[in-house]
Amino acid sequence: MCSTRKTSVMDEKVIENEEIHFQENSNGFSADLTIHQDKLKQISKTGLNLEKEHIFNMPSSLTKAFKTAFKRKNEIFYCVSTKEMSVDIKDVSGQVYLPLITKQEIQQKLMKIDPSVRSKISMIHLGAVKILLTAQFRQGIDTSVKMALIDDRIVNRKDSLLGAARGNLAYGKFMFTVYPKFALSLQSKNLDKTLSFIHQFERKDLMKTGDKVFTVTYLIGYALTNSHHSIEYRKNSNIEIEEVFKDIGQIEESPFCDISPIDENWTMDIARNKKSIATGSSSRRNFRIDESLLENKDENLLRSMSTKIDTLGKKLSLIYDNE
């Protein structure tokens, strides 16, 4: 008589406005944490305001109605995702990239949100990406590695750089953190290319094809919102390296451009009969949710696996300023 053991574990749990979800199989481990802003301090919306009464001369009753009509609640879902995967030696030459955030992952998140709120969510705010490389060979081998996180939607290679690092796996590990600090529409055609991780391992002769040379583990902090103006970022730097890794590696920030001087040419095309940019809610409806992405719930499995992700919530305080 023999018994079989499942090689894949998947579970999810919703507690009020908090949701955790994980998956583990022979290819690696992934976990997600989503928290609605009602579970955190309310983030005030500032910086974009027009006082209607300063534009229109309105009776007091109409002023009140106008303000009521234009009240808008910030819908914010803070998310932390972590994934781990082994990399084959054949994929370390810098010719492939790893997408760190995908539309499929976002679809999975949106399926857990109440439909009345989900229909409003239109933006993703990218807060932080922490990347850890762990060697799958003994310590003491000189193994230089180059890494870059790029926004591959941007055509110019220099402009696409979010952060780069050079390190060595002689001590077994290397880690750095990039802070993108920008938002984009969920309708962006190439959203999957926004956070593209590229790596180049110098010792391509260390192993043969089929052997796994190192493990990539990454942690992403982001927020799903209904507005581009919902989030303020805490970090001032664009990239950081842990103090312990500074002796064996270095980092490079994305360069800030020299602003071109304003010229005297104000010529632009203001002719009539231009095409209108489409507005309205129809664009959001185009973001189709795949119902097949819903998974079965099993609270017993959650209890046995929750220890692997119980610290993810604490990561939020390192990414967003909730003061």
Curated annotation (Swiss-Prot):
Single GO biological process annotation from the record: transport of virus in host, cell to cell
User: Which key words tag this protein in UniProt?
Assistant: Coiled coil, Host cell junction, Transport, Viral movement protein
Entry's localization field: Host cell junction, Host plasmodesma
Q: Name one Pfam family in it.
A: MP
Residues folding into a coiled coil are 292-322
GO CC terms? host cell plasmodesma
Source domain of life is Viruses
The record's function comment reads: Transports viral genome to neighboring plant cells directly through plasmosdesmata, without any budding. The movement protein allows efficient cell to cell propagation, by bypassing the host cell wall barrier. Acts by forming tubules structures that increase the size exclusion limit (SEL) of plasmodesmata, thereby allowing viral ribonucleocapsids to spread directly to neighboring cells.
User: Family per UniProt?
Assistant: Belongs to the caulimoviridae movement protein family.
What is its quaternary makeup? Homotrimer, through the coiled-coil domain. Interacts with VAP.
Protein's recorded name: Movement protein
* The organism of origin for this protein: Figwort mosaic virus (strain DxS) (FMV)
